[in-house]
């Protein structure tokens, strides 16, 4: 039996017909003060976000430290004596706008010595089981500042793995979806100004594999670092608006109790709304929030993409992008992975969310002090492609 990992010595101690009731409360966080978002005046939304949405700073600091610890632990312990000579190269947490109470995040375990996307696909089950085993060891050793709970799998051969880090005292928890990934960007990590052609070749290779295997979007986790960078350096107030939209999304999820579009699609929609309609560092939050909800109601026209990491200059990539953008809408391409439409493929999900968004547009949170409705930003809903940056 391996000795306890000694990377760090700490221990875990113990509105009438308006929008429906929208309260900041969760079954997992019963002590949170109940606050009605729908009846919060537009002029007080910034205060609402500041007081009620960001994760507790103490928990956030402990969480970051524990993620670093888990990364070091997995790098030391994983795949010792395994049949496949892979090693953990790094662990990346994909979350920059965490909410108070309960949040969800991806934890991508990048593997070096893994030669291809196909190997990731074929060996995913083995990798998941190895990581699960090591996390269970860490859970028993209790060396983290917050509480670690590895979720049990319903199926022995499951290719999914999740664990929870929580602080009962702070009433805060984050559930992580763990995904092993081929480190396709390994050569670019330490290069501050990589040759754009390297990205082009990487995406051409990705497109070739995904179309051949009919696995579009399957390898998006391999580009998690680029997805992180897309949001990491955004304006603080834009991140606050993303938190507000995520909170609204969670309220809709609790009320409707049915599958909704992926949350990440709403985050990207928020970025698009700001880039297209404002770009002001000190924008009006109610206007931004209203713009996002109006875009949700127009989901059948959404066609959005960015050309930050991939573009139309390479013929193979260009041909593929044109095919993607001509598909049934909504289309919201992952800025880090052109094969992944983050809008999903279920129009019923969008129809449900659009109906809920429409019911919110008359709420007090969109009214000024004289009770007039705030105006949304002017955002184009139909632009021909290709263009330099973003299309709707």
Residue ranges and their predicted role:
Residues 85-95, 144-161, 260-267, 286-290, ...:
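Short amphipathic alpha-helical segments embedded in low-complexity Lys/Glu-rich regions
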Residues 230, 236-355, 359:
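Conserved nucleotidyltransferase catalytic core and NTase-mimicking acidic/glycine-rich helix/loop elements
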Residues 189-191, 198-226, 233-246:
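A structural motif
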Residues 345-392:
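C-terminal helix/juxtamembrane-tail motif
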Residues 52, 56-64, 98-100, 116-124, ...:
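Amphipathic alpha-helical protein-protein interaction segments
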Residues 1-105, 109-129, 145-160:
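N-terminal regions immediately upstream of nucleotidyltransferase
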Residues 94-95, 112-115, 168-170, 181-186, ...:
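Conserved beta-strand elements of beta-rich interaction domains across eukaryotes
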Residues 74-85, 101, 124-212:
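Conserved catalytic core of two-metal-ion nucleotidyltransferases
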């Amino acid at each position: 039996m391996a000795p306890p990992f000694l990377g760090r010595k700490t221990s875990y101690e113990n509105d009438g017909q308006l929008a429906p009731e929208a309260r900041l409360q969760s079954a997992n966080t019963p002590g949170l003060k109940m606050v009605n978002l729908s009846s919060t005046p537009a002029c007080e939304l910034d205060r609402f976000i500041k007081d009620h949405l960001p994760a507790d700073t103490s928990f956030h600091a402990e969480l970051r430290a524990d993620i670093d610890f888990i990364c070091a632990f997995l790098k030391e312990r994983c795949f010792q004596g395994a049949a496949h000579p892979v090693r953990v190269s790094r662990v990346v947490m994909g979350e920059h706008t965490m909410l108070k109470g309960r949040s969800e995040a991806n934890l991508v375990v990048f593997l070096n010595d893994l030669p291809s996307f196909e190997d990731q696909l074929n060996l995913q089950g083995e990798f998941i089981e190895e990581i699960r085993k090591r996390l269970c060891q860490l859970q028993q050793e209790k060396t983290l500042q917050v509480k670690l709970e590895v979720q049990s799998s319903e199926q022995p051969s499951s290719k999914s793995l999740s664990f929870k880090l929580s602080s009962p005292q702070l009433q805060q928890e984050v559930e992580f979806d763990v995904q092993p990934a081929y480190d396709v960007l390994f050569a670019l990590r330490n290069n501050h100004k990589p040759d754009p052609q390297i990205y082009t070749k990487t995406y051409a290779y990705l497109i070739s594999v995904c179309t051949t295997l009919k696995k579009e979007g399957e390898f998006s986790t391999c580009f998690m670092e680029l997805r992180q960078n897309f949001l990491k350096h955004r304006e603080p107030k834009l991140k606050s608006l993303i938190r507000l939209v995520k909170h609204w999304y969670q309220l809709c999820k609790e009320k409707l109790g049915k599958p909704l579009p992926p949350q990440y699609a709403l985050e990207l929609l928020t970025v698009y709304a700001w880039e297209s309609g404002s770009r002001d560092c000190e924008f009006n939050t109610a206007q931004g929030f209203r713009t996002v909800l109006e875009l949700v109601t127009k989901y059948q026209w959404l066609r959005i993409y960015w050309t930050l990491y991939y573009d139309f200059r390479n013929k193979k990539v260009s041909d593929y992008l044109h095919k993607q953008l001509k598909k049934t809408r909504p289309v919201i391409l992952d800025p880090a992975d052109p094969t992944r439409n983050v809008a999903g493929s279920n129009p019923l999900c969008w129809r449900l969310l659009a109906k809920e968004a429409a019911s919110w547009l008359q709420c007090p949170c969109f009214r000024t002090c004289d009770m007039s409705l705030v105006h949304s930003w002017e955002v184009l809903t139909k632009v021909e492609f290709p263009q330099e940056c973003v299309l709707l």
